[in-house]
A protein has these predicted regions:
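A metal-dependent hydrolase metal-coordination microenvironment
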Residues: 37-189, 193
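Domain-core and long-helix interface of multi-subunit machines
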Residues: 3-56, 68, 148-250
Length: 250
């Protein structure tokens, strides 16, 4: 199998397929057919994967870290640790040390920091907190704790989807949470469904309805009243972008 095909398979549907592709790529690395950048002492221990919101599976995230010359890499998904074991195994296969953890959003309304913008740019009295360096023996225990958070967020997500559909109803646009949004996530495998999944599903529907380019820009800036910068308009005017749906989301 060609190297590029193996890289694509790092985002395959099943964990077994993804790790199998990593093993095949490691063989190319060992033979010198794939040149690995020298490690320069940099690390990224806050990497999101498809178990929250990302275009990269845990295995693909590790691959990208190796090919970026990182010395270590860590998985941090919102409200989820079920991608951690795959991430650890991919690190062993591809030869890079890994760390694991998770990120949660916390409410500070009843504290002296109420009303302040802490580290959440979109909301006051709210802060993101990360748990780094989770012991490998505690993954199941952490997941049991995070299940409650995922269940609460699912209720919130459904309400957000309902409200968004109310806004979009005059334009004959509607999303079904279970049919259109959840399948974009790894919820079936213990991943989280985030607000970005909702917006990504909407981006797909907008592209289907208006296409890529001027008509979509006009709808966003006209009927929806979204102020678009010149840079954003330029990005959305490029129908050939490989990440067009992400540009719409953002």
């Amino acid at each position: 199998m060609r190297k590029q095909e193996l890289i694509i398979r790092l985002n395959a549907k099943t964990r077994e397929e993804r790790l199998s592709a990593a093993r095949a790529l490691r063989a190319f690395m060992d033979s010198g057919e794939i040149v690995v950048p020298e490690k320069a002492g940099y690390t990224n221990n806050h990497v999101h994967t498809t178990f929250s919101f990302s275009p990269y599976s845990p295995t693909k995230a590790v691959w990208m870290a190796v090919m970026s010359g990182l010395s270590t890499v860590g998985i941090i998904d919102h409200d989820a640790v079920c991608g951690a074991e795959e991430f650890i195994e991919a690190g062993k296969i591809l030869g890079i040390p890994t760390t694991i953890g998770f990120e949660i959003r916390t409410d500070w309304s009843n504290t002296p920091l109420a009303g302040r913008r802490i580290n959440n740019p979109d909301q006051v009295s709210s802060a993101y907190i990360c748990a780094h360096g989770l012991a490998h023996t505690q993954i199941a225990k952490a997941d049991n704790y995070l299940k409650k958070i995922r269940a609460a967020r699912a209720k919130r997500n459904r309400e957000m989807t309902r409200r968004l559909n109310a806004v979009l109803e005059p334009f004959d646009i509607a999303m079904d949470y279970d049919a259109d949004i959840v399948p974009l996530s790894c919820a079936a495998f213990g991943g989280e469904v985030t607000e970005r999944h909702i917006l990504f599903a909407l981006a797909g529907q907008l592209i289907d309805k208006f296409g890529k380019g001027g008509a979509l820009v006009s709808f966003l800036s006209g009927p929806l009243g979204i102020g678009l910068s010149d840079k954003q308009k330029a990005l959305l005017a490029n129908p050939d972008s490989d990440i067009y749906a992400y540009d719409v989301l953002n």
